[in-house]
Amino acid sequence: MTNGGRNGEENKNLMNGEAKAEPETFAQFLYNKDKGTVLGRTGTSWCQITVFYIIFYIFLSAFFIGCLSIFLRTLDPKVPRFYGKGTIIGVNPGVGYQPWLKENPDSTLIKFNLQDSKSWEPYVKQLDNYLSKYKNTNETRDCGASDNNDALETDTDTFPCRFDLGLFEKANCGAKDQYGYKSGKPCVAVSLNRLIGWRPVNYDDGSVPEEIKGRYKPGSITINCEGATSFDKEHLGKVKYIPETGIDGRYYPYVFVPSYQQPIAMVKFDTIPRNKLVIVECRAYASNIEHDISTRLGMVYFELFVEDKKPVAAPAA
């Protein structure tokens, strides 16, 4: 017998002299009748590993739920864990306005035609919806001129100050006057974003900005609206503020309570030109409100376009 023949016979045997097992096929891996295995495991082995993983994942889930429960207990549902300076919330309130149509959320254009009620009715409806929350006066209280919401921070039994919309009605910026949109003297509601614990800080004597010197009242947030460009400033016309001193500071600080009523001010554009687009820049003023044009900090922009022309009839189908 040649060396090649002897080597071939030796390769078929293990070192202990037993014959090598034939390579297992994929079908045999799936189910091996001789060994009684499925996917390489016997029934007993499958039972053992199944029980192990069931117990393992039960303990793992219990550990996760326990950690999550401990974490949630450290959170206050009314106050963010981190807020104020150095946090993403910050200390400088943003400025918002209404009406802002949800159907076109990316647009800051307020455009309507005096001769087409369908064009200005959506703005009236939006303001109706926005101001409807003030009709619920449950768990609120009347606050006098010297009262405020200071007690809300320490006394959970105190109700927040009730915000009265009557001032807007008297100035023809209420629902009965369609907020001025029907007459072409639109009113825009201006408010500050809610920041936990924030309240306006008064200007020092002599440091009140020129833009608001005649209207500034300590304790309030004065609103001032101007045209964004020289063209806009020229055509903006007469602007009326309701109240004249801006947002009343006695409704601060903001505290998370369900019945809290956010203070607002109305800006009425009495002589806005017809058929001209005017870009408006409104700023909120208090000593602790910063302004930054690049990030629009402490200010808000929107466009006004009041048309006065016969609406174009829709083509017949």
UniProtKB/Swiss-Prot annotation:
Listed transmembrane segments: 51-71
Protein's membrane topology: Single-pass type II membrane protein
GO molecular function, one term: ATPase activator activity
Primary site of residence: membrane
Cystine connections: 173-187, 225-282
Glycosylation sites: 138
Keywords: Cell membrane, Disulfide bond, Glycoprotein, Ion transport, Membrane, Potassium, Potassium transport, Signal-anchor, Sodium, Sodium transport, Sodium/potassium transport, Transmembrane, Transmembrane helix, Transport
Cytoplasmic side: 1-50
Lumenal side: 72-317
GO biological process: intracellular potassium ion homeostasis; intracellular sodium ion homeostasis; potassium ion import across plasma membrane; sodium ion export across plasma membrane
Cellular component per GO, a single term: sodium:potassium-exchanging ATPase complex
Subcellular location: Cell membrane
Assembly: The sodium/potassium-transporting ATPase is composed of a catalytic alpha subunit, an auxiliary non-catalytic beta subunit and an additional regulatory subunit.
Role description: This is the non-catalytic component of the active enzyme, which catalyzes the hydrolysis of ATP coupled with the exchange of Na(+) and K(+) ions across the plasma membrane. The beta subunit regulates, through assembly of alpha/beta heterodimers, the number of sodium pumps transported to the plasma membrane. Implicated in genomic response to various soil bacteria that affects fitness, lifespan and brood size.
Family the entry assigns: Belongs to the X(+)/potassium ATPases subunit beta family.
PANTHER family: NA_K-ATPASE BETA SUBUNIT ISOFORM 4-RELATED, SODIUM/POTASSIUM-DEPENDENT ATPASE BETA SUBUNIT
Name of protein: Probable sodium/potassium-transporting ATPase subunit beta-3
